[in-house]
């Protein structure tokens, strides 16, 4: 039982290291891509993608949820 637990812990640590390194490598790669070419520079300055993040409509369910949080 102890060996299985130790193997599980080692596997979790290795998986976490892999997930974090993949994110770091992705950020580094995006940084390298943004250094080369005008397209990447123009894409970084394009703020139209931020319009999708804002939803101006609040549904009744959202209002009820906020009221529940504020109690």
UniProtKB/Swiss-Prot annotation:
Signal sequence, start to end: 1-23
Keywords, ordered alphabetically: Amidation, Antibiotic, Antimicrobial, Cleavage on pair of basic residues, Cytolysis, Membrane, Secreted, Signal, Target cell membrane, Target membrane, Toxin
Listed name of the protein: Cytotoxic linear peptide IsCT2
Function in brief: IsCT2 shows weak hemolytic activity and antibacterial activity against both Gram-positive and Gram-negative bacteria probably by forming pores in the cell membrane. IsCT2 adopts an amphipathic alpha-helical structure.
GO cellular component, one term: membrane
Tissue expression summary: Expressed by the venom gland.
Major localisation: secreted
Species this protein is from: Opisthacanthus madagascariensis
GO molecular function: toxin activity
Phenylalanine amide: residues bearing it: 36
């Amino acid at each position: 039982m102890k060996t299985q637990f130790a193997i599980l812990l080692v596997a979790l640590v290795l998986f976490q290291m892999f997930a974090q390194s993949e994110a770091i490598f992705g950020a580094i790669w995006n940084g390298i891509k943004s250094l080369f070419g005008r397209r990447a520079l123009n894409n970084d300055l394009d703020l139209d993608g931020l319009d999708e993040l804002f939803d101006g409509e609040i549904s009744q369910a959202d209002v009820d949820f906020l009221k529940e949080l504020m109690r």
